[in-house]
Amino acid sequence: MIHQLENDEVILAVDTKACEIASFQRKDKEIEYMWNGDPAYWSNRNPILFPHVSSPADKILNFKGEDHKVNNHGVCRKAEFRFLEKGSDYLLFEFEDNEETYAQYPYHFRMEVRYTLVANQVRIEYRIFNEREERLVFGFGLHPAFNCPLNPKRSFSDYRIEFEEEDVEGKVLPLNYELFDRYPTYVIHDPKSRMFKLTDGENAVIMETEEGFHIFALWTPKAPFICLEPWVNTLDDEPGIREFESAKGNIILHKGGEFRIAYRFSII
């Protein structure tokens, strides 16, 4: 089910399926900034990567001494979230473990996702709670896909990623599909930048990551969109890993613990 929020500048629509943004538009432009989930290319739009980013080639991970078949990027990509409430400037959603998630990931958890609008920007905050006796172990990442080109009269190669700091030469990475022949996923560990701008010089998406993200990645399946992905950690850093709890960068919550992380993006 779609829930909508708007202010004087933008309109945001969020789907309870996967808690993904279905649409994000400015009121003064006829531009859709978010990818539409066309399954001919990629059926997701901006999934939550939890409790792991990526997965082993055989999709088997060991949790607490037992092997479990897992989905790529975890249990939230196809999950149905529960809508909790709408305020004047926010939407709040919730997801809890269930029988299906427990078969892949044998831990109990609760997650809240809050979308807040400020002018032409949406801030998205994620809170993960451990309300049980057993400790909770997980990784985390985000995978938002933005239309590229934003202007249908332009092409993918008219766009670039501008970095706040010198994470790439000259702080600018020109986009072209050949880049993703060389790097199927373009990954930067420990980026100095907290701000990343997708732009053709006219229209833009400006992403700002808050504290806690340690990796920034770019991905496209040579499609009319680009994913700007902030991650806490990834299993790709440890090829062949089986023991999930030993993965680098995992977060551990004990009873009563809470993990909180957020990012935001503006549309121009």
Model-derived segments and spans:
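Short, Gly/Pro- and small/polar-rich lid/capping loops
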Residues: M1-D8
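Short, well-ordered beta-strand segments enriched in hydrophobic/aromatic residues
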Residues: E9-V14, V113-Y115, V122-N130
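Acidic-aromatic substrate-binding/catalytic surfaces of carbohydrate-active enzymes
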Residues: I11-D67, C227
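Short Pro-Gly-centered flexible turn/kink motifs
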Residues: V14, L61-G65, K69, I251-I267
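Extended, loop-rich substrate-binding clefts of extracytoplasmic carbohydrate-active enzymes
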Residues: E66-V118
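Active-site/ligand-binding surface loops and adjacent short beta/alpha elements
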Residues: R135-V137, A145-G212
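Beta-strand-rich interaction surfaces with strong enrichment in secreted/lumenal proteins
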Residues: E112-R114, K248-L253
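Acidic/His-leaning functional-site neighborhoods
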Residues: H68, H73, K78-L84, E178-G249
